[in-house]
Amino acid sequence: MTGGPGSSPLFLLLLTGALSGARSRALGAYDGNASVSSACTPGFSADGYTALVSPNIMEGQKLLKVKFNGCSSGAQGIWYETNNPDFKVGADGAVYTAREVQIPAKQAKFIVAAWDHETPEKWEAAIQLFVEETPLNQSQYQTGSQSQESEQEQSQSGTLLPWRQHHKGLRRQKRDWVIPPVNVPENSRGPFPQQLVLIRSDKDRDDTIRYSITGVGADQPPMAIFNIDPIFGRMNVTRPLDREERSSYHLRAHAVDINGNKVENPIDLSIYVIDMNDNRPEFSSPIFNGSVDEASKPGTYVMTVTAHDADDINTSNGIVMYRIMDQSPQSPSHDMFVIHSKTGVINTVAAGLDREKVQQYTVVIQATDMEGNLNHGLSNTATAIITVADVNDNPPEFTRKMFIGEVPENHVDVVVANLTVVDRDQPYTSNWNAVFKIISGDPDGHFTIKTDPVTNEGIVTVSKPVDYEMSKVFPLIVMVTNQAPLASGIQMSLQSTAAVTVSVNDVNEAPYFPNRNEPIRKLEGESAGRLLITFSAVDPDHSMQQVLRYSKISDPANWLAINTTNGQVSTTAVLDRESPFVKDDLYQAKFLATDNGNPPASGTGTLLIQLIDINDNAPELLPKDAQICERPNGNGINITAIDVDRKPSADPFVFELPSVPYTIRRNWTIHRINSIYARLSLQIGYLESGMYDVPVIVTDSGNPPLYNTSIIKVKVCPCDNNGDCTTIGAVAAAGLGTGAIISILICIIILLSMVLLFVMWMKRREKERHTKQLLIDPEDDVRDNILKYDEEGGGEEDQDYDLSQLQQPETLDHVLNKVAGVRRVDERPVGAEHQYPIRPVIPHPGDIGDFITEGLRAADNDPTAPPYDSLLVFDYEGSGSTAGSVSSLNSSSSEDQDFDYLNDWGPRFKKLADMYGGADED
């Protein structure tokens, strides 16, 4: 088909009628013959509408127009809405922008819905906007939107759809065609490849055209889903599509000549996968857990279950409806719960939930797609476990109306009775935990009730001692409640109160001394045998008529005695306030009172005696010694006095000098400073240095007053300009003469000399110790001499041979070749010598220790000192001796011999060397 005069060749698109949607019109043959339509069904003229728009759309701009077919009623009573607030639909079906819109991608999608006012029917159509590469003006949009309807009408009759053509110059442009999307149902069974569209260019009459497609599903992963016949332009799908994997494909068709030159501009193809109901609803969890309070009213929210269908939620395939299939147990009704078919919210529908009867319900929930159509939809099930939560709708009740208990008097923390209760609420919760309260019968708070957390019993215990003599029976009234308040409308039961009768058992109580907050007041100085007080105790067991006996527990000064029968306390010594056992004028003693009960009981009492001071102590003078200059220079000695008595028996004091001997008042004088201080000074102009005893009389202010004569040892000494005693004066004052001082100095010198001599002697002794030789003189050392002891053992008698040849042979061959098992022990071993540990040095060893140490050191360092500590062999002379046989020696030979080598044998052979080597010198 060609365009009008002056138009360029058209790029054509043919849709195959077999792959259109449920609402798509089948395309006729390529020759343009129209197909017949079926009966009228209300709805949109198409399942989807498309339009080309610019990236930026102004507010109020018209994009396209949807057509709704209302059959006989037309479009009256129909109103439209969109799911995108950026767009709105007019009453005539025109789609506008509600605000300025900027499309971020190359396309935008939204849904237009049509509602009927009279019926709840709803119809939907998909709108898809494609962004063109070159923006169009307002008139072009209008042309495009108007041409869509005629384009759709042409598509119904099988007319080819010419695509937009571009012209050069100012020539009038042909109307643009909106290319509708291709709808392909998922899960198609083929056969494959299956043709979708036919793409043709009218230039193929003159040139050889090659067609190709690009995009996801063609040359991009997933690849090879779609292909195109490069010669004829037939685009096919090669395998079944799955909408849940990908819901749409956007391809671009290209037309080039055999040289690869572009013949037509590429066109965009949108392929939408039509959803099929091939997925069951899937619950988010196989088991849902919820709870609801017992006694809840109908309509109370319980829980929400959710299921998801992978199919298109905009179609019935993905719309899930819920229903309850089963409830277990079916008590008190088989319909205790209801579920909202669309939201999955479960509510109570009947009253009568009681946890004490049914604690848990199991509800089977079914989710069905196709809007709950059980005949055509797919279903799945899940389990909802609904727990009936406990509320405090059962008050606790005592198992008995009266409880009995008993308790011994004067005991605490004793269990009196266990109060048992029952509560049908859930155990170990605040609705079950019991709280007990004594509402009467215990005004003084002698009893408390604690709750056993395991048994929920009330344990009545004694918190304050009870007295049998005061009260023999306690009639208690106890009430029990829960930690949580009762539910609304629930009243307390008559069984929530009970009586508890507590009997008190009499026991032998200890006697007690009445509290004496105030001490008894007594004058100190009370003589022995005086009665102070009758310190009697009280026996609380009046009915027992028991006898009390008294004894003393504590009497620090041993001043008191108590009568064992009547408790009279008397003195055994004079009371003295100044005693160290008296603290703050109080003397404390403790006494014990014991009854004759079985077993006997005893109580203690403390007696406080406040001693009133009397003037029984004379003052004491201070200081006891002092020093003063031999010549008066205005200074003196400050004296004072102390009196252990208190005022008015203490200060002010009177200080005076005695009249006898007369020299006291002649040499000394006293001047009063204040009530407790006075100054003692010289009366004369000079007093010889020395020690003087100055008596001073001190009198207190008691009635009668007491006085005391005290001696002050005064040291009179010569003083310097500062009034301080000089050293000479101090020595003289000490009473030491010149001879005594010289004697002391001589003694000091002698002592120092002795110390010096002792040190010198010790150093000399230490030096001798280090240089000391062996006590045995070397001349008398015969260890290396060969002596004859007239032994009958073997061996040579001739001893005039060279011992060094035996002890130090020139070679070791005879040692190495000696017979096994025979060893010389009178010579130093050839091998490595054992190293002995060094003995620790004693700081000052004795003579014997020094001698032993030096001898050991000399023996250890002597290489030729036999014997070693081993078995001695005397009959073995070794092998390979350089001297040959000893018998070959001729000591009487007259031939001249050279004995100079004897001098090389060391000091031990010095005598032998002198005998032979020094003969010529003699």
From Swiss-Prot:
Provide this UniProt record's keywords sorted from A to Z: Calcium, Cell adhesion, Cell membrane, Glycoprotein, Membrane, Metal-binding, Repeat, Signal, Transmembrane, Transmembrane helix
GO MF assignments? beta-catenin binding; cadherin binding; calcium ion binding
What Pfam families does its record include? CADH_Y-type_LIR (PF01049), Cadherin (PF00028), Cadherin_pro (PF08758)
Q: Which residues lie on this side of the membrane: Cytoplasmic?
A: 762-922
Tissue specificity, please? Expressed strongly in ovary, testis, brain, eye and kidney, and weakly in stomach and intestine.
Q: Which residues are glycosylated?
A: N33, N137, N236, N289, N314, N418, N563, N638, N667, N708
Main localization category: membrane
Residue ranges occupied by any Cadherin domain in the UniProt entry:
176-283, 284-398, 399-513, 514-621, 620-728
GO CC terms of this entry: adherens junction; catenin complex
Q: Where found, per UniProt?
A: Cell membrane
The topology of this chain with respect to the membrane is: Single-pass type I membrane protein
Signal peptide feature range: 1-24
Cite the record's Low complexity compositional bias ranges: 138-159
* Entry-linked InterPro entries: Cadherin, Cadherin-like_dom, Cadherin-like_sf, Cadherin_CS, Cadherin_pro_dom, Cadherin_Y-type_LIR, Catenin-bd_sf
Q: Extract the ranges annotated as region (Disordered).
A: 138-162
GO BP terms: adherens junction organization; calcium-dependent cell-cell adhesion via plasma membrane cell adhesion molecules; cell migration; cell morphogenesis; cell-cell adhesion mediated by cadherin; cell-cell junction assembly; homophilic cell adhesion via plasma membrane adhesion molecules
Asked whether the UniProt record includes Cytoplasm among its keywords, one would answer no
Report the transmembrane regions from the record: 741-761
Q: Does Transmembrane helix show up as a keyword for this record? A: yes
Q: Which SMART domains does the UniProt entry name for this protein?
A: CA, Cadherin_pro
Q: Enumerate the Extracellular topological stretches.
A: 25-740
Function statement: Cadherins are calcium-dependent cell adhesion proteins. They preferentially interact with themselves in a homophilic manner in connecting cells; cadherins may thus contribute to the sorting of heterogeneous cell types. Probably contributes in early embryos to cell-type non-specific cell adhesion, but in post-neurula embryos may be responsible for the development and/or maintenance of anterior neural tissues, and may be used in adult frog for the development and/or maintenance of neural, endodermal and reproductive organs.
The record's comment about this protein's domains reads:
Three calcium ions are usually bound at the interface of each cadherin domain and rigidify the connections, imparting a strong curvature to the full-length ectodomain.
Kindly provide the name given to this protein in its UniProt entry.
Cadherin-4
Upper classification of the organism: Eukaryota, Metazoa, Chordata, Craniata, Vertebrata
